[in-house]
């Protein structure tokens, strides 16, 4: 893991930015800071998040992201989004989903199964709902 005191100025700026924006820096992010371009690529998730909040809301983003994390069998990612859901009062094992949230969860699962072959029902419903 990257230690702040022994880091370059560029790494220190990224480290400080994380603390300012999120109050802390996770071990995974500290590890990624060994390579600033890799860290920045990972952090683009937050850019996407900020763009999607006005369209689908925080909860839907967390459910969608959790579905993708589960589908990819990414334990760290699954735990991250699971914690967000639990902290917001949801039960990730038995969420009560709106039609839009169900569609996004199904889409997340389909992306993991075969991103080049999303079922027509999901694709058509997404197009109708978000076009």
Spans of features found by a protein language model:
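Mobile cap/lid helix-loop segments that border enzyme active or cofactor-binding sites
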Residues: 1-58
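Short alpha-helical scaffolding segments that buttress acidic/His motifs in well-ordered protein cores
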Residues: 32, 46, 63-68, 104-112
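Alpha-helical bundle/repeat cores within regulatory domains of eukaryotic proteins
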Residues: 123-126
């Amino acid at each position: 893991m990257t230690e702040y005191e022994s880091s370059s100025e560029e790494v220190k700026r990224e480290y400080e930015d994380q603390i300012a924006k999120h109050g802390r820096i996770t071990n995974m992010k500290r590890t990624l800071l060994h390579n600033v371009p890799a860290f920045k690529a990972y952090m683009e998730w937050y850019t996407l998040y900020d763009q999607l909040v006005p369209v689908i809301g925080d909860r839907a983003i967390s459910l969608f992201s959790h579905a993708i994390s589960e589908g990819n069998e990414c334990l760290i990612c699954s735990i991250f989004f699971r914690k967000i859901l639990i902290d917001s009062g949801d039960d990730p094992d038995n969420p009560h989903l709106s039609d839009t949230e169900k569609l996004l969860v199904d889409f997340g699962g389909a992306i993991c199964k075969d991103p080049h072959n999303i079922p027509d029902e999901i694709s058509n419903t997404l197009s109708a709902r978000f076009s």
